[in-house]
Amino acid sequence: KKQIITIALCIPMWMQAQNIDHVLQSIEQNNKELQSAMQLTKAQKMENRTANNLSDPTVSYSSFYKNGAGPGHGTEFVASQGFDFPTQYITRNRQADLANEALDKQQQAVRRDILLKAKILCLDLILLNQEKALMNIRKQNADELEALYGKRLEAGDANILEVNKIKMERMNVQTEVAQNHASHRNALQSLLAMNGNLPLEFAETNYPQVKEIMDFNTMRDEVIASDLDLQALSFTTKAAEKQVSVNKQDWLPKLQAGFRRNTDSEMSMNGFVVGGSIPLFSNRKKVQIAKAQALSAQLMQDDARLQVENNLMALFNEMQQLKEAMNAYDMPLLYKSLDLLKQALKEG
């Protein structure tokens, strides 16, 4: 399916596809699912940045008294700020950039899927519009034949079985017309729902012209290079590999610096607070976890690429078979045969 998506959206379209372009532009602006995905991506990207925030500053105040007789009262005020080793912020920032690139590609893939669904509905409507035109011709022929054989029956040139056969054909055509109308209405309603239930019209009867795909290798290279899912997995893999570096640097000490003021009944003193913590326990096995996750991401990327290539081969073969089947149809001959059949029935 994802390969069909890529092919369908990358195929160039000429003037008769302008109506489809207009529909897709409108849906891109008004589709609620797409708007929701954009906001979710925005939130996730900001969340990725929060991992690189400074920790909250700490403030403490102490008051203590001297035991025994005589005055004695002292206070202590400490304000400090903890921070990581400076290189950790640089590494985490690069990891967040890669993770956000993956999110952008995922959001673009959601957009692609939504627009493909809308494009398929447009193509369905084109088919239904073509069927409607053909059924109108069939209905007109059936009406004329029913009137003609009604007169022949009155003149004695036809029997009741022939007239009933014409009437049955006319009823069958009316049933197909009703089914076509229902299918058209359902497809158009689905298109309107994707457009946020805003008004939308689509009366196109011609399919967009497409560039014929002759060489599988060329198609494969183009699709793989532009496949958004593969691009997202590529950035996810790079982000996972960068996370290994982040976790390795988590072994660096956490630093702390601040201001300290002590006072008592006789004097006051100001000074600085400098300290740190060594992550002997909090970072255990995090590097191994990150390496396993990076390997998993790489394997997922390799598997996805293989799936893309296999699906492309199957789709290419199916496309070739459909092309041969379409070439077997002579549409002008079919319409000519319909006219000849109508003329033959009129002449008896």
Where are these regions (language model features)?
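Periplasmic alpha-helical coiled-coil/stalk elements that build and connect Gram-negative outer-membrane
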Residues: 113-226, 315-322
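A glycine-/polar-enriched beta->alpha junction
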Residues: 29-35, 45-56, 77-95, 105-112, ...
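Solvent-exposed loop/turn segments connecting transmembrane beta-strands
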Residues: 40, 64-73, 236, 260-271
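Transmembrane beta-strand segments that form the barrel wall of outer-membrane beta-barrel proteins
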Residues: 57-67, 89-91, 252-263
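Sec-dependent signal peptide recognition
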Residues: 1-7
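Amphipathic alpha-helical coiled-coil segments
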Residues: 36-48, 110, 114-137, 144, ...
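Bacterial Sec-pathway N-terminal export signals of envelope proteins
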Residues: 15-58, 63, 83, 91, ...
